[in-house]
Amino acid sequence: MECVISNNAGAYALERAKNKGIQALCISPKSYESRDAFNQAFVEKVMEIHPDLIVLAGFLVAIPAAMIEAFPNRIINIHPSLIPSFCGVGYYGLRVHEAALARGVKVTGATVHFVDSGMDTGPIILQKAVEVKEGDTPKVLQQRVMEEAEWQILPQAIDRIANGRL
């Protein structure tokens, strides 16, 4: 791992990266005059690093088209649902789990997928199901999905890609 970039200066991932001697950067749209200026700065920074793989985890900013074009099938995302359920515009963080509970699903989970020009529409790499339990709140369900699915399948997907098994 060469670099961790977050759009949130308070992200724990930045602190963890620094503690491991990994470059940690915050590039936030709030720091730029326009979305175009942010997109340009973001793409330029990533191009400087020239990563083999870009892993999105909790990055709640749409990826610029120029980056998707520059890194085809080299950007992956973790999403806290079993795509195609509860995904796309407006479905992120607790909102996903609120929607799952409101719908009354019995099973939810997480998906690792390649990033394409759509929102959560890229080819699926891995999925893992998680039981919804009676009395779950969005926060409780979110934590269970992270622990039982996200934290397991994201490293598995990275390993498969890194070792040419995908």
Regions found by a protein language model. Name each.
Residues 1-166:
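One-carbon transfer enzymes
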